[in-house]
Amino acid sequence: RSNETDGNDYYFVSVSEFKNLINQDKFLEYAKVFQNYYGSSKDVVFKKLNNAENIIFDIDWQGTQQIKSQKLNYKIITIFILPPSRNELYNRLLNRDRNDEKIAKERMIQFNEDVLHWRDYDFVVINDDLENCYKKIIKFIKFSQEKMDPNYQRLISSHVESLIN
């Protein structure tokens, strides 16, 4: 898309360079989507994780499965974002892709497959209102972080012990 910039939205490389990076196992996940290759660099991801940064991936269910299959020593929270309706999704795709009906129709066909995988995610949110969707996502993240907190785990463990004794 014309509004995307190299090094900000994506790192743009040639197809041959991308395939070379695949062969070198440089991606945590990758896919070819509508004639374009997309991937998440292991080096970039692990550098951020080693700096205790949280990472948000905007990827499809196949990319999510690739990351989950890596058995990383990091907590992964998966959130599937649904549109409020098929019609609204189509309109959003048209607006995003400069009213290119061909692209919007191709993406709607792909959506028919993608939506079947919603159960594979930890959380699901309907993006009918951007602000509400954002608040729900933050709530899911905070809930997951609380569950991972060792102090919280000790508190729950202690409480369970008191209930069974």
Where are these regions (language model features)?
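ATP-dependent small-molecule kinase phosphotransfer cores
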Residues: R1-I55, W61-Q65
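Switch/connector loops and helix/strand junctions flanking conserved nucleotide-binding motifs
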Residues: R1-N3, T64-I67, R86-R92, N132-K136
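Conserved catalytic network of the ASCE P-loop NTPase/AAA+ motor domain
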Residues: N3, K47-N50, S69-Y74, L116-W118
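Conserved AAA+ ATPase "sensor/coupling" helix adjacent to the nucleotide-binding pocket
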Residues: Q24-L28, R92-N99, K139-F143
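Alpha-helical elements of Rossmann-like donor-binding domains used by nucleotide-donor carbohydrate transfer enzymes
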Residues: V44, Q66, Q110, K136-F140
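Conserved phosphate-donor/acceptor-positioning beta-strand/loop module used by diverse small-molecule
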Residues: I55-W61, K71-R96, I126-N127
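Ras-like small GTPase catalytic G-domain
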Residues: Y74, R86-L89, L94-L116, E131-N132
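NTP-dependent small-molecule kinase module
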Residues: R98, E113-N165
